[in-house]
Amino acid sequence: MKKKLTRKEKREAEKQINFFEEFLKIRKHFFCNFNQKLKSVNEVRHSSYITYEPDILLFTIIMKNVSGIHSMNKMTKDFNNDTVINNFSKVLGYNDLEEIPHYDTINNFLKKLPISELEKIRIYMIKALMRKRCLEKYRLLDKYWCIDIDGTQIELTSENLLV
């Protein structure tokens, strides 16, 4: 029987994990077209206001969540160093990335971005996992897909939750 980790031991173990490296392994194995999907987001911003492409903005917020950073302000502070900027540049294929976007820039972008654009990325990811049969062990009686329904919402956010 495995020894249950204490909360302190769990925190210490998490310090040893390189979340960025782990994310890159997962992305490479399961989502080989992930960067292209981020680049293909149709945005509504006026071209004269664009400093950062959609893939940079979306990748930054994804890495915030992957890294376990809970606030946008902390993300801006933690990511504002040359190592992070160089890593983002390499992963996204940019040679001229000098700064990571400020959290206000990301928030403004996300406010204007149609939800359907994010749904396209989510659908791509779910389909990729299903194609690789990663979700097979979660079938009911090895035959049926289970669907979780959360009935706590007050409003419907989308007509097409998953196509």
Predicted feature residues:
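Charged, often Cys/His-bearing segments associated with DNA-binding zinc-finger transcription factors
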Residues: 1-35
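Short, positively charged, Gly/Tyr-enriched micro-motifs
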Residues: 50-124, 128
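Flexible, active-site-adjacent loop/turn segments at secondary-structure boundaries
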Residues: 36, 98, 152-154
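Short N-terminal helix-initiation segments at or just after the protein's N-terminus
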Residues: 1-8, 44-53, 93
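Alpha-helix boundary/capping detector
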Residues: 13-14, 101-102, 132-136
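Active-site-proximal, Lys/Arg-enriched surface segment
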Residues: 107-163
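Glycine-centered secondary-structure boundary/capping sites
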Residues: 33-43, 68, 89-96, 133
